[in-house]
């Protein structure tokens, strides 16, 4: 089942639990606007190249639409639509005043020079600048994009609308970015994991963790979990996987990964088959890479007691059912990885106020939001007798539905 089908299925189950009117249910599912633009740029060699860009603006009942822009060769309308919808529910679960959006350009950023990436970003911004804005739609980095990409968007947008630092988040700090933003998603994973474990009388210390993915989210999660006393025993990235039953030295692994462009060859553990990583014996499994990695083919072999979804849509619905029967608790992506968009909200607030927070305030506020989000999800679980995923979806959908009705938008 692809991401769009799975997200829509979860929404429909939540709508049924909430008893939503069928017309309201339909209106919440259909995107507010879908944008498709052609972006032609001159390459460094003088030839012209054309790319297709997308922006799906799903819902704005609770505030400006919010979501990343990704550069990847497999970007397609269905994926962007699914991720935009997911952002609507995610921002509602986090209880930040946003709706959901997502964007992307079908390209391979590794095959483009910095100059070509800049030209592509500026052309894309020119095509959508009148459809985004501080109080309309606020983009952010995603796969294949970063703070520099946001700086280019900010600059190009400002040519049309005047200097507007709040039009994007995830910017460099020198252009109004927030302290703590780089670590935000990984730190949010830590706080969410702490909340889940505390519910069962446990803490981070002494728990054995396996993490799939060692990019921004996975590496920060590993570092912060290790600092909190957790034992990270296995990690993988695109180059390979490494295991040390006594716990990996995360600081050394990060240094090795930076110097060698991956964890392959790290001498602080044993190399293992990346395909076996998800089924390693552990207490907590954190998929922090691609979607759909936990499926009906490997769900029965998973030995973790808890799964924290740091990636978007890492668990297929079929696997969900298998793991539920095994008693595995899954903290869903729309709660577990909401730290990034939460600190993006803090950045937006700081830009509008013209007042910068220190990093301690950012981190303290993030912990408050993540802990409260978990508590709110648990309350929905008790009210509707459902698991954590459906508790999160019912919470998010209910908040958006209430805002829609209050604004008089129901069909």
UniProtKB/Swiss-Prot annotation:
Belongs to the Glu/Leu/Phe/Val dehydrogenases family. The keyword Ribosomal protein does not apply. GO terms for cellular component: mitochondrion. Its main location: mitochondrion. Its EC number is 1.4.1.3. This is Glutamate dehydrogenase 1, mitochondrial. Transmembrane segments: none annotated. InterPro entries: Aminoacid_DH-like_N_sf, Glu/Leu/Phe/Val/Trp_DH, Glu/Leu/Phe/Val/Trp_DH_C, Glu/Leu/Phe/Val/Trp_DH_dimer, Glu/Leu/Phe/Val_DH_AS, Glu_DH, NAD(P)-bd_dom_sf, NAD_bind_Glu_DH. Disulfide bonds: none annotated. GO terms for molecular function: glutamate dehydrogenase (NAD+) activity; glutamate dehydrogenase (NADP+) activity. The keyword NAD applies. Expressed in roots. Expressed ubiquitously in various tissues. The active site is at 102. It catalyses: L-glutamate + NAD(+) + H2O = 2-oxoglutarate + NH4(+) + NADH + H(+); L-glutamate + NADP(+) + H2O = 2-oxoglutarate + NH4(+) + NADPH + H(+). Keywords: Mitochondrion, NAD, NADP, Oxidoreductase, Transit peptide. Residues 1-18 form a transit peptide. It is found in: Mitochondrion. The gene is GDH1. Induction: Slightly induced by NH(4)Cl, NaNO(3) and NH(4)NO(3). Induced in roots after nitrogen (N-deprivation) deprivation. It comes from Oryza sativa subsp. japonica (Rice). GO terms for biological process: cellular response to nitrogen starvation; glutamate catabolic process; response to nitrogen compound. It is an enzyme of class 1 (oxidoreductase).
């Amino acid at each position: 089942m692809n991401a769009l089908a799975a997200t829509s299925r979860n929404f429909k189950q939540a709508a049924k639990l909430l008893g939503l009117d069928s017309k309201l249910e339909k209106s919440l599912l259909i995107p507010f606007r879908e944008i498709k633009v052609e972006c032609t740029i001159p390459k460094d060699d003088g030839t012209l190249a054309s790319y297709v860009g997308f922006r799906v603006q799903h819902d704005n009942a609770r505030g400006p639409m919010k979501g990343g822009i990704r550069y990847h060769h497999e970007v397609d309308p269905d994926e962007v639509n699914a991720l935009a919808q997911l952002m609507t529910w995610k921002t509602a679960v986090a209880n930040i005043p946003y709706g959901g959006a997502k964007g992307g350009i079908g390209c391979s950023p590794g095959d483009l020079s910095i100059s070509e990436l800049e030209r592509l970003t500026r052309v894309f911004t020119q095509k959508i600048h009148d459809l985004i804005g501080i109080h309309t739609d606020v983009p952010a980095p995603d796969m294949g994009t970063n703070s520099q990409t946001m700086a280019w968007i900010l600059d190009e947008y400002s040519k049309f609308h005047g200097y507007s630092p709040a039009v994007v988040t995830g910017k460099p700090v020198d252009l109004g970015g927030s302290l703590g933003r780089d670590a935000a998603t990984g730190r949010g994973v830590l706080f969410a994991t702490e909340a889940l474990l505390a519910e069962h009388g446990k803490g981070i210390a002494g728990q054995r963790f396996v993490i799939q993915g060692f990019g921004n989210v996975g590496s920060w999660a590993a570092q912060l979990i290790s600092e909190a006393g957790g034992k990270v025993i296995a990690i993988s990235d695109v180059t390979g996987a490494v295991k040390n039953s006594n716990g990996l030295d995360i600081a050394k692994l990060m240094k090795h990964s930076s110097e060698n462009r991956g964890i392959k060859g790290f001498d602080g553990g044993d190399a293992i088959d990346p395909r076996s990583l998800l089924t390693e014996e552990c207490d907590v499994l954190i998929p922090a890479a691609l979607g759909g990695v936990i499926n009906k083919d490997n769900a029965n072999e998973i030995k973790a007691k808890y799964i924290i979804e740091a990636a978007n849509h890492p668990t297929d619905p079929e696997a969900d059912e298998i793991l539920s029967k095994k008693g595995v608790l899954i903290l869903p992506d729309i709660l577990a990885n909401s730290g990034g968009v939460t600190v993006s909200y803090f950045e937006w607030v700081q830009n509008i106020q013209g007042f910068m927070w220190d990093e301690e305030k950012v981190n303290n506020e993030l912990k408050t939001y993540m802990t409260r989000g978990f508590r709110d999800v648990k309350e929905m679980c008790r009210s509707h007798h459902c698991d954590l995923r459906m508790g999160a979806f019912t919470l998010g959908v209910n908040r958006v539905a209430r805002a829609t009705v209050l604004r008089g938008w129901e069909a």
